[in-house]
């Protein structure tokens, strides 16, 4: 296992992995600090190091992310895996939600209409993963 902070660049293979159609597990913390883990689709912007998850406002993952301000996204495919850790914030701004929906549509499919949609934005601070996906140069 390798670990880097985001000042270390993800390899081209890692960026490709993060654009392939895979689901991930989103971990947030409940009020009692126990983990809440759910399967999600997400997108990652390598320029800003922001991962985005679209969800319904008031969902448990949104409530947890808003309260604790922490989240981890873990994606795995065979021996390849990455965990993206960082500060989470829930954004209900219509332009931010629209942008997140467009990004989601590029990676997965057009999301169904949802007037209560928000976006969980995770500012990635640390990356763990299989050594072949991390560039420590």
From Swiss-Prot:
Phenotypic consequence of residue 117 to A: 8.9-fold decrease in catalytic efficiency
The protein's name: F420H(2)-dependent biliverdin reductase
Assembly description: Homodimer.
Organism: Mycobacterium tuberculosis (strain ATCC 25618 / H37Rv)
Placement of covalent cross-link Isoglutamyl lysine isopeptide (Lys-Gln) (interchain with Q-Cter in protein Pup): 47
Gene Ontology MF term list: coenzyme F420 binding; oxidoreductase activity, acting on the CH-CH group of donors; protein homodimerization activity
Mutation effect (residue 108 to A): 44.5-fold decrease in catalytic efficiency
Top EC class for this record: oxidoreductase
EC number annotated for this UniProt entry: 1.3.98.-
Protein family: Belongs to the F420H(2)-dependent biliverdin reductase family.
Protein purpose: Catalyzes the F420H(2)-dependent reduction of biliverdin-IXalpha at C10 position, leading to bilirubin-IXalpha, a potent antioxidant. As biliverdin-IXalpha is produced in high amounts in macrophages infected with M.tuberculosis, its reduction by Rv2074 may play a role in protecting mycobacteria against oxidative stress, aiding the persistence of M.tuberculosis infection.
SUPFAM superfamilies: FMN-binding split barrel
Reaction(s) catalysed by this chain's protein: (4Z,15Z)-bilirubin IXalpha + oxidized coenzyme F420-(gamma-L-Glu)(n) + H(+) = biliverdin IXalpha + reduced coenzyme F420-(gamma-L-Glu)(n)
Keywords (A to Z) from UniProt: Isopeptide bond, Oxidoreductase, Secreted, Ubl conjugation
PANTHER family linked: F420H(2)-DEPENDENT BILIVERDIN REDUCTASE, HEME OXYGENASE HI_0854-RELATED
UniProt keyword annotation of Glycoprotein present: no
Gene3D superfamilies: Electron Transport, Fmn-binding Protein, Chain A (2.30.110.10)
